[in-house]
Curated annotation (Swiss-Prot):
UniProt entry tagged with the keyword Lyase: no
MF terms (GO), sorted A to Z: rRNA (pseudouridine-N3-)-methyltransferase activity
Database matches in InterPro entries: Alpha/beta_knot_MTases, RlmH-like, tRNA_m1G_MTases_N
Taxonomic source organism: Mannheimia succiniciproducens (strain KCTC 0769BP / MBEL55E)
Gene: rlmH
Cellular localization per UniProt: Cytoplasm
Pfam families: SPOUT_MTase
GO cellular component: cytoplasm
Protein's UniProt name: Ribosomal RNA large subunit methyltransferase H
Assembly description: Homodimer.
UniProt KW keywords: Cytoplasm, Methyltransferase, rRNA processing, S-adenosyl-L-methionine, Transferase
Annotated binding of S-adenosyl-L-methionine, by residue: L72, G103, L122, S123, P124, L125, T126, L127
PANTHER family xref list: METHYLTRANSFERASE, RIBOSOMAL RNA LARGE SUBUNIT METHYLTRANSFERASE H
Recorded catalytic activity of this chain's protein: pseudouridine(1915) in 23S rRNA + S-adenosyl-L-methionine = N(3)-methylpseudouridine(1915) in 23S rRNA + S-adenosyl-L-homocysteine + H(+)
Length: 155
């Protein structure tokens, strides 16, 4: 199983890249964790946000292919680390790749939300999207460590 973090935005600060890659390199070879960046639509004073969201959504779903779509969205279901570890086991048993979708400044397109088999809420707070990349990578790594009795996670 491969986990793909599909996120809108390509020009992230260095700390985001460093933070994400710190966790990405820790994943085992049989469960690679990769980042796919979708270019953000051009936003401006007269931008057609609905059209931009639609284009970003199509690109995200295209990048996912046949993988299981899991959106990161405030109205999604919050998971504890133990619950995320159980989700990870369930996803592995499902046999498909996992696509974790992070939208752009206006969130996810209706098409992405409709395609989602699950929706995960990291927090009721609105978080900066660059930070979410790092938090998701760490959270999924921690869940993996729990499922394999790796010493990273401590109660």
């Amino acid at each position: 199983m491969k986990i793909q973090l599909i996120a809108v935005g390509t020009k992230m600060p260095d700390w985001v890249k460093v933070g994400f890659e710190e966790y990405q390199r820790r994943f085992p070879k049989d469960m690679p964790f990769e980042l796919i960046e979708i270019p953000a639509g051009k936003r401006g004073k007269n931008a057609d946000i609905k059209r931009i969201l639609e284009q970003e959504g199509k690109a995200m779903l295209s990048a996912c292919g046949r993988g299981k779509v899991v959106t990161l969205d405030i109205p999604g279901k919050p998971w504890t680390t133990d619950q995320l570890a159980r989700q990870l086991e369930s996803w592995k048993n499902d046999g498909r790749d996992i696509c974790l979708l992070i939208g752009g400044p206006e969130g996810l397109s209706p098409e992405c939300k409709a395609a989602a088999e699950q929706s995960w809420s990291l927090s009721p707070l609105t978080l900066p999207h660059p930070l979410v990349r790092v938090v998701v990578a760490e959270s999924v790594y921690r869940a993996w460590s729990l499922t394999t009795n790796h010493p990273y996670h401590r109660e």
